Amino acid sequence: MLSLLHTSTLAVLGALCVYGAGHLEQPQISSTKTLSKTARLECVVSGITISATSVYWYRERPGEVIQFLVSISYDGTVRKESGIPSGKFEVDRIPETSTSTLTIHNVEKQDIATYYCALWEV
């Protein structure tokens, strides 16, 4: 087992913010990654068409308030929180699998957090 100096644990929990009949699920409960590697977290949408939604990703670090990270709108426009290093987070939406993925590049100790996905039906 690697020590905390070599790994970061990314806890993943689902947050449901849907207006309508959709359902949101994060199938991966937790993820442990080696520092400086890439982590990918998925959010699966059912009950509605993902391309008719905007998906938002947030994180909550231990002892801190929830922070908006990045979103992808129904038209594919990506919006990122100011102050977050460029290239740190990527978001995509895959209509064929009704999935949104948050990619975290160069995992650091500061990335230890609970990550939430939410969606807004257009």
From Swiss-Prot:
<comment type="function">
    <text>V region of the variable domain of T cell receptor (TR) gamma chain that participates in the antigen recognition. Gamma-delta TRs recognize a variety of self and foreign non-peptide antigens frequently expressed at the epithelial boundaries between the host and external environment, including endogenous lipids presented by MH-like protein CD1D and phosphoantigens presented by butyrophilin-like molecule BTN3A1. Upon antigen recognition induces rapid, innate-like immune responses involved in pathogen clearance and tissue repair.</text>
</comment>
<dbReference type="GO" id="GO:0009897">
    <property type="term" value="C:external side of plasma membrane"/>
</dbReference>
<dbReference type="GO" id="GO:0042287">
    <property type="term" value="F:MHC protein binding"/>
</dbReference>
<dbReference type="GO" id="GO:0045087">
    <property type="term" value="P:innate immune response"/>
</dbReference>
<keyword id="KW-0472">Membrane</keyword>
<dbReference type="InterPro" id="IPR013783">
    <property type="entry name" value="Ig-like_fold"/>
</dbReference>
<dbReference type="GO" id="GO:0002250">
    <property type="term" value="P:adaptive immune response"/>
</dbReference>
<dbReference type="GO" id="GO:0042605">
    <property type="term" value="F:peptide antigen binding"/>
</dbReference>
<keyword id="KW-1279">T cell receptor</keyword>
<dbReference type="Pfam" id="PF07686">
    <property type="entry name" value="V-set"/>
</dbReference>
<keyword id="KW-1003">Cell membrane</keyword>
<dbReference type="InterPro" id="IPR036179">
    <property type="entry name" value="Ig-like_dom_sf"/>
</dbReference>
<dbReference type="InterPro" id="IPR013106">
    <property type="entry name" value="Ig_V-set"/>
</dbReference>
<dbReference type="InterPro" id="IPR007110">
    <property type="entry name" value="Ig-like_dom"/>
</dbReference>
<keyword id="KW-1064">Adaptive immunity</keyword>
<keyword id="KW-0675">Receptor</keyword>
<keyword id="KW-0399">Innate immunity</keyword>
<feature type="disulfide bond">
    <location>
        <begin position="43"/>
        <end position="117"/>
    </location>
</feature>
<dbReference type="InterPro" id="IPR051117">
    <property type="entry name" value="TRG_var/const_region"/>
</dbReference>
<feature type="domain" description="Ig-like">
    <location>
        <begin position="27"/>
        <end position="122"/>
    </location>
</feature>
<dbReference type="GO" id="GO:0042101">
    <property type="term" value="C:T cell receptor complex"/>
</dbReference>
<dbReference type="GO" id="GO:0005886">
    <property type="term" value="C:plasma membrane"/>
</dbReference>
<protein>
    <recommendedName>
        <fullName>T cell receptor gamma variable 9</fullName>
    </recommendedName>
</protein>
<keyword id="KW-0393">Immunoglobulin domain</keyword>
<keyword id="KW-1015">Disulfide bond</keyword>
<keyword id="KW-0391">Immunity</keyword>
<comment type="subunit">
    <text>Gamma-delta TR is a heterodimer composed of a gamma and delta chain; disulfide-linked. The gamma-delta TR is associated with the transmembrane signaling CD3 coreceptor proteins following the stoichiometry: a single gamma-delta TR heterodimer associates with one CD3D-CD3E heterodimer, one CD3G-CD3E heterodimer and one CD247 homodimer forming a stable octameric structure. Upon activation, gamma-delta TR complex associates with FCER1G to initiate intracellular signaling.</text>
</comment>
<feature type="signal peptide">
    <location>
        <begin position="1"/>
        <end position="20"/>
    </location>
</feature>
<keyword id="KW-0732">Signal</keyword>
